[in-house]
């Protein structure tokens, strides 16, 4: 049971950028947020900014890096003088196979169950990098992906944690033979994600465009722009 006051702005994690305007304050706790887009569009930067902001408040972050791309130097840039204060608040997992990713998420759920009062954020960056390279048959892969998303949804809902997963894209042709950009993982990730944000690059103006594709209380199609800078995103 919760009182209504528990659903105010402290229920959201800010990004310190235009994305906060897009989401009316930031990424919501208690739900799964999917961020998808092409390489270099800002998915990991948003995730790291969220992680640093949570860690600065003395809360724990669980960060699952499936691409081996987490950069300590980037975290130092974002955190600035607060870096020494946050290093023990960000817990990193680095699975190298889809099955290992599966086991990591089971371990994380058990750990958060014991420490949920201390944890505000769980990041899976990215959800599908290992899914795309695994040798398992697609039917089994999809089944395992669904199980993983179920674990993340449980973490979000049961322990009031903001779950953020990043996702890649692919191109396909629609009925009119037009090239359409879609998120990898299809209906599986779409089903479990309560908030979905699509990122695009605008290299002409050195900006990124974020478009809201799904939200339970904000209209689809709302947009915001942001820039990637040394101290994070603005």
UniProtKB/Swiss-Prot annotation:
Molecular functions (GO terms): ATP binding; ATP hydrolysis activity; ATP-dependent DNA damage sensor activity; damaged DNA binding
GO biological process: DNA recombination; DNA repair
One Pfam family from the record: Rad51
Keywords: ATP-binding, DNA damage, DNA recombination, DNA-binding, Nucleotide-binding
Family as reported in the entry's similarity comment: Belongs to the eukaryotic RecA-like protein family. RadB subfamily.
Functional summary from the UniProt entry: Involved in DNA repair and in homologous recombination. May regulate the cleavage reactions of the branch-structured DNA. Has a very weak ATPase activity that is not stimulated by DNA. Binds DNA but does not promote DNA strands exchange.
PANTHER family: DNA REPAIR AND RECOMBINATION PROTEIN RADB, RECA/RAD51/RADA DNA STRAND-PAIRING FAMILY MEMBER
The name this protein goes by in its record: DNA repair and recombination protein RadB
Organism: Methanobrevibacter smithii (strain ATCC 35061 / DSM 861 / OCM 144 / PS)
Gene name of the encoded protein: radB
């Amino acid at each position: 049971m919760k009182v209504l006051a528990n659903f105010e702005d402290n229920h959201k994690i800010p990004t310190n950028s235009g994305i906060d305007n897009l989401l009316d304050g930031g990424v919501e706790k208690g739900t799964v947020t999917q961020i998808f887009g092409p390489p270099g569009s800002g998915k990991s930067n948003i995730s790291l900014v969220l992680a640093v902001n949570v860690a600065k408040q003395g809360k724990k972050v669980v960060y699952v890096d499936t691409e081996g791309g987490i950069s300590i130097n980037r975290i130092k840039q974002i955190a600035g003088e607060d870096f020494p204060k946050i290093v023990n608040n960000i817990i990193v997992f680095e699975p190298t196979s889809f099955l290992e990713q599966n086991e990591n998420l089971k371990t994380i759920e058990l750990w958060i169950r014991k420490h949920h009062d201390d944890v505000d954020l769980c990041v899976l960056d990215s959800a599908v990098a290992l899914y795309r390279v695994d040798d398992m048959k697609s039917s089994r892969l999809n089944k395992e992906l669904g199980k993983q998303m179920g674990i993340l949804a449980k973490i979000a809902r049961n322990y009031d944690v903001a779950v953020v997963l990043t996702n890649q894209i692919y191109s396909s042709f629609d009925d009119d033979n037009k090239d359409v950009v879609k998120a990898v993982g299809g209906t599986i990730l779409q089903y479990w994600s309560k908030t979905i944000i699509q990122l695009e690059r605008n290299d002409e103006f050195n900006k990124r465009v974020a478009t809201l594709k799904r939200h339970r209380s904000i209209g689809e199609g709302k947009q915001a722009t942001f820039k990637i800078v040394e101290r994070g995103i603005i």
